[in-house]
Amino acid sequence: MSQPVRQTVPRQPRKLSYDLAVTEHRWTVPERFNIAADVCDKHPREKLAMVHEHFSGAVREVSWGELQDLSNKFANVLCSLGVARGDRVAVVLPPTPETAAMFFATWKLGALLLSMSVLYGDEGIRHRLSDAAPRVLVTDAANAARFGKDATSKLVIDETSVEDVSRDFDAVDTLADDPAQLYYTSGTTGLAKGIIHAHRYILAHEEFRYCHDIQDGERFHGMGEWAWAAGICPLLGPWRLGAVQYVYQREGGFDPHKQLDFLSRHEITNVFATPTAIRSMMSIADARTRYPQRFRIVCSAGEPLN
């Protein structure tokens, strides 16, 4: 198998003017739009899409062609389980190439994605499953036992689960206003509440163009879980603009030393991190010498940095 094609990008950010951006920017929302087509299928097959590192140290390079084929295979599997346009697909998986492909597969079917972190407690997951009533729950062997004999159909996947499935799939032609994603609130004032987002919602995330200044082929890393907007949008947004996603599959919770080591070894240039993660990493006194970085841009959100 040929190796995915890497691209180099300049280290210095472009000079962006807020006033000029406001003057020149125009919202462009086509009538027909699908996240999977815009984020995944438009890229050249040979181009590098993701570098995934497991906490064991294993590293995988994944091309766009591999993600395109894998998402089509998953779409065929979901279709065989009765998933149709407008249905909901729940996903409880760690951040892996297979997980991203399952996201795209869901959107190619015209279904709604409900992604939940493997770090969620059982009660939180049960509430979301009960409230969303998904057609299928997708998980892995490490988490399957958490769901027992739940009424929802369960699909357990791994790296080899769709080897013999066809990679040909005709994606549904969706409207930009068709529902695509179901996010849940944090539940600070009662039970978490579901909020439906249409396919067009990703077009609103222009921060990756104007704040992160994403350049084609740039090494990007987002630290958020792929279960909330601040985790999934930093996956999809940079990909739309041609970045290479560097994904770290943690063992358990956030470890600032392991995170800084990952960023340093892979020479990540563009990062989205929560204020909590930034404070945790800054608490390491000798971080600059132990973990030299190549950051071009680091962005954060959610609360003030201090």
Protein language model regions, located:
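Adenylate-forming
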Residues: P94, T139-F147, R250-G252, I268-N306
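ATP-dependent adenylate-forming carboxylate-activation enzymes
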Residues: L93-P94, M102, A111-S130, A141-A144, ...
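N-lobe entry segment of adenylate-forming
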Residues: M1-V62, E66-C79, A142, A151
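Structural core segment of the AMP-binding/adenylate-forming
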Residues: S80, A101-V165, F169-V172
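Conserved AMP-binding/adenylation subdomain of ANL enzymes
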Residues: L203-G222, A227-T269, R279, S283-I284
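Conserved AMP-binding/adenylate-forming core of the ANL superfamily
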Residues: M50-F104, G121-R126, R200
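Conserved pre-ATP/AMP-binding loop-to-beta segment of ANL
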Residues: E46-L48, S166-Y184, L191, A198, ...
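Conserved AMP-binding A3 loop
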Residues: R60-G65, A180-A204
